[in-house]
Amino acid sequence: MEQFEIRGLSFSYPDAAKQTLSDVSLTIKKGEYVLLCGNSGCGKTTLLRHLKSVLAPTGSRTGEILFDGVPLDKVDAKRQASAIGYVMQNPDDQIVTDKVWHELAFGLENLGVSRETIGLRVAEMSSFFGIQSWYHRDVSQLSGGQKQLLNLASIMAMQPEILILDEPTGQLDPIAASDFLNTLKKINQELGTTVLITEHRAEDIFPVADRVLVMEKGRLVANNGPRQIGQSLFDRNSPLFPMLPAPMRVFYQCAGSGQAPLTVREGRTWLTDCFREKVPTVRSLPTASQKQFGEPALRIRDVWMRYERQSPDVLKGLNMEVPAGCLYAIVGGNGAGKSSTLRTVCGATRSYRGKIEVFGREIQKYPKGKLFQNCLSMLPQDPTNLFVKQNVRAELEEMNGEEAEQLRVAELCEITHLLDAHPYDLSGGEQQRVALAKVLLTKPKLLLLDEPTKGLDCGFKARFAKTLKRLTDEGMTVVMVSHDVEFCAENADIAAMFFDGQIIASGTPREFFGSNSFYTTASNRMSRCIFENAVTAQDVAALYRENLGEKA
């Protein structure tokens, strides 16, 4: 039975030149797990928000949306609140109370549920989601993964019939993201709750999805099973092909025959079968020789930092050197201290012990404001922290008065068509690109990036990687904190692991990711039974072809 039926939905924002949604028609059946994907700005979030009246954007709309056969605008607010659960990308946008236990109960209180029922459901959700150990904690003390799990538990306490999730793992580390998606799979399979999710990082979702919907420029262009969608994207040489799980990409790049693998396990089996009769003679790629870098652009020596006098230390004797002209990527769990390191380097927080030197000079010894004049800039995790103007054009003008330079950077970040838009009307990926443009306009020598690929589609991510390479080749130094392990493996000069307030290991991507079990890529986990240090889909395909040629 259809839970949602959308008929000819078109929508445009006020004063917008083009429609954001154009004649979208689809059905979502009860109990389905559906993945919605597409490039940033293609209309995914706008479509999802139309499925809950209280979140529907303002603008011009035509078409019809039915929920359980009833027009959505005729379904009362209480029914929508309980039956349609919605999880946003940023966990902080949805949390409204200060205690975990109160957040779990808040939605039920607003629905007028009895105290006894609230107690039962809160207890049940705490057990199901493993929240008991932090049930009494302040929400402010939770990691990003815990906050997002709390959001999901709070919504599930209201026993929704469908869960709508808009890039829910965008701010989670790989392990927290995997745990979150496994919980979502359990909810769908064991409770029968319908799931509609949009996610750029589709590695863990493709194998469990019943259907995949693909949007382009506001239109629904594909609606099929995961394997059929993968074949279609490959046949069309679609820019969305890099979105596919690594085992599928390796399979198609190797001209594999038979059924494409969806999971690491299936990919490992396929690869093992390929080499069953021939032992590979070339098992590893040369460890990429490091570029010749200059003197350290950033040197951190024995730095200790805490946010409050009585609070625990966040940075614990941190030592770190970043050579000039290097792309230095830092990975690690939520709450390990990665973002705190960037904030401490740029002076937003102060260490109480140790030294931080930027280009050989302690940051405290730079004259007021000089550190940020063509020297150091930072892209924060939340791009909206940089927005203070009424449109994108004014945001860029604030950073650099030269119109030619503004247009050059706008073209580089692919935001020329957004110049007259309000920054808060943009999608998450578009906001990220605008914030990046603002930062690049300061022409820094040392660029700090906190989750720069969050919300970016695979196409722009590839172009962004080329931009970073060009900038580092020209001498800029980039320090990047990221949960995007694949992006780091493909593009970093040096990768480092952050744990418990310190850097505990670093090396070239093939050295670093080739030896990890969890903080590594799906390509590496899939191929390590055959190859030694292949960390990207391209690495696996290259070794495959070198040993077997083009034939699968």
Predicted regions located by residue number:
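Conserved ABC ATPase "signature" region
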Residues: 116-134, 403-418
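Catalytic Walker B motif of ABC-type/P-loop ATPase nucleotide-binding domains
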Residues: 163-166, 447-450
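ABC ATPase nucleotide-binding domains
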Residues: 235-296, 519-552
